[in-house]
Amino acid sequence: MERESVCVLGGGSTKYGKLDDSISDITLQASVGAIESAGIEPKEIEAGYISNVFGVADKQVHLGPVVMSNLGISECPSLSIESACGSGSVSFREAFANVAAGFYDAVLVTGTEKVTHTGTDWTTTYFSYCSDFFYEGQAGASFPGLFASMARAYLNEFDATEEDLA
């Protein structure tokens, strides 16, 4: 399949905010919404790319096989993707590349996080584990802090304004 032939057929989401449902249920709800809006059946899905970083906070990691099983397609290959802030983008890229290469015609890409119940200290600490903890994390660097430092360096290097970044 040509890259130009790859498209997004549907999308799904849950409500935003503090949800009582488990991370597995939240992921399933969003996945079902995407499948329904695409106008396909779960059995038409040939692979799943499920992104999640903080599943451990809800006592559930390796969401790929869990989601596919809950959709009734446990035989469908899936990949659980954990790539910090880029998890959703990495999932989308992998799905796009595999469809464009002709490996699959229909795939599911879902990204889910649930950290409203963890507290800021836990979440910030866990996020620091996504970087090189012994080099950056122990120094107190966090992704928001690192992103801010890079933005500030860009502004200084190129004599840009905050509006230029917006």
Each predicted region: which residue ranges?
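Short, flexible coil/turn micro-motifs enriched in small/turn-prone residues
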Residues: 5-7, 12, 83, 97, ...
